[in-house]
């Protein structure tokens, strides 16, 4: 598990009411790394935040952490199943 993925998972679990439903996957696509964050449908609004500010902050943190590892990170927040 990469450091970026761990950071995203820890932050998401801290922000949600259902931390056990948080799931994070990481995949490589050419020169980019895609991190998908799956959360409970009831928590999706908390992670997006007002006007998308929380989601934007999470994406910025993931991108910055990825730069330290030499990775181009894209973070997508999705409703889990």
Question: Which role fits each region the language model picked out?
Answer:
Residues 1-46, 56-81:
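RNA-contacting regions in translation and RNA-metabolism proteins
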Residues 48-52:
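Glycine-centered tight-turn and secondary-structure capping sites
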């Amino acid at each position: 598990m990469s450091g970026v993925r761990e950071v995203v998972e820890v932050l998401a679990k801290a922000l949600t009411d259902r931390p056990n439903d948080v799931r994070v996957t990481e995949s490589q696509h050419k020169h980019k790394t895609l991190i998908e964050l799956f959360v409970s449908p009831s928590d999706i609004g908390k992670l997006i935040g007002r006007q998308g500010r929380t989601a934007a902050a999470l994406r910025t943190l993931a991108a910055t952490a990825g730069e330290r590892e030499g990775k181009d990170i894209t973070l997508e927040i999705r409703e889990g199943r």
